[in-house]
């Protein structure tokens, strides 16, 4: 399992479309080239603290089954980081999301 922090409104819009295409705050899969993810809950909390502290809209944590994605997932170390993060190189099918949990930071 891997995790992705999402605006609840972005996830709600993805459900009827059948797939989620938001990479990170304000950027789409097409703009970024991949969807940012976290390898575990601790990593997701770190991402929230660094990047989502100013966000006032409701957030959800998506739990994603990599085997259901149908696209590559690569562990990569972003520039300026000291740990690897899973990057999802395609849209996330709604069926690949096994849990959606409200997230507060």
Segment roles from a protein language model:
Residues 1-105:
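Conserved, structured core segments of small domains
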